From Swiss-Prot:
Pfam family, one: NQR2_RnfD_RnfE
Signal peptide boundaries: none
Primary gene name: rnfD
Subcellular compartments: Cell inner membrane
Lipid bilayer topology: Multi-pass membrane protein
Native source species: Colwellia psychrerythraea (strain 34H / ATCC BAA-681) (Vibrio psychroerythus)
Spans traversing the lipid bilayer: 20-39, 68-88, 129-149, 215-235, 238-258, 267-287, 300-320
Name the record gives this protein: Ion-translocating oxidoreductase complex subunit D
GO BP terms, alphabetized: electron transport chain; transmembrane transport
Amino acid sequence: MAFWIASSPHNHNHTKTPNLMRLVIYATLPGVLAQWYFFGWGNLIHIGLAMTTAIICEFTVLSLRKKPISHELFDGSALLTALLLGICLPALAPWWITVIGTMFAIVIVKQLYGGLGHNPFNPAMAGYVMLLVSFPLQMTLWQPPLTLVAVDLNFTNTLTTILTGFTVEGYSVEQVRTSIDGITMATPLDTLKTNTGLGLTVLESIKNPIFGENLALGWEWVNAGFLLGGLFLISRKAIAWQTPISFLLSLFICSFIGYSISPDSSASTMFHWFSGATMLGAFFILTDPVTGATSNKGRIIVGLLAGLLVYLIRTSGGYPDGVAFAILLCNMSAPLIDQYTRPRTYGHLKGDK
């Protein structure tokens, strides 16, 4: 009896790119909703503006490159890039910040290198870092949670502030950032970094209202939302578990060592986990299959390296949150890491080329 044997691979994956992109977008909803609940409409407006800009840029570049627009424009990758960038921006950043960042992410970082699957860097993080370096003032005007803001940031006020720089009543962004107590607010990471640099202890720093009663007012729930979405992606096997778990483990170990050595000047492990962009970076950006490592060992190494870099930048660098910089550095290292962690090909001896 003759048997017909199909050529390898025998294990097929029927997941299509648009389906995967939609799944990741859906998984961000808990974090985005928490962001809206605690910080208002700002990021939702930026997300909508970024998505519109991304579609226009993608359509224009695909037309110039004479690529199949109907297929590549609607694969969801541009929308996901815009979503991640919109999440990361300050809620009251001016509208042109979103447009410039999205154009850079789509046109330069993604399409200039050949489109989806060819970009060496994560487009959203590259766009964010470009904005942070080029426009540091606009990119560091973080809005405190709504409970600490003296101005009513409804949808109209927020939209007007993003478009003009002033609320309907005439308040500037700097005035909006002023708390009910008359103190200009910053993020918990920024506040802690500034205060410890001035010689204050962590215990003295967390008396600031921005820290709330737990870890970081509002930010802990935003991170919890992205953690929930990330676990959903792992359960659906949409992302590999090695990278986010090793990243969180590395950040936990580094912060635990720092806190054990100097609790007066080092934040706790849970603070590092549930503040800034920790969970967003762990589950939604580091797991990018295009710019990350491909082998299981490589993914673990990338996660460990990213966690170490985030901790070092947060504690010793010039920026309060180092997730974006750490991810781009890991993107640069991923090809080299893959080179030395590539599994042996079946049928070949170790060391064979």
